[in-house]
Amino acid sequence: APSEPHHPGDQATQDQLAQYYSDLYQYITFVTRPRF
């Protein structure tokens, strides 16, 4: 399972934030999807 991404912090660049939110979205999708 993917690990929860860490927020890059207040000094993060837009690219770092975009990558973080992309990773976070994938993480949440993985964690919350039903297990059949």
Curated annotation (Swiss-Prot):
Phenylalanine amide, modified sites: F36
Main localization is: secreted
Q: What molecular function does GO assign, one term?
A: hormone activity
Top-rank taxon of the source lineage equals: Eukaryota
In this record, what's one Pfam family?
Hormone_3
One annotated Gene Ontology cellular component of this protein: extracellular region
InterPro entries per record: Pancreatic_hormone-like, Pancreatic_hormone-like_CS
Cellular location of this protein?
A: Secreted
Keyword terms: Amidation, Hormone, Secreted
Give the residue spans that cross the bilayer: none
Q: Which family does it belong to?
A: Belongs to the NPY family.
Q: What does this protein do?
A: Hormone secreted by pancreatic cells that acts as a regulator of pancreatic and gastrointestinal functions.
Q: What is this protein called?
A: Pancreatic polypeptide
Q: Which organism is it from?
A: Rana temporaria
Write the gene name: ppy
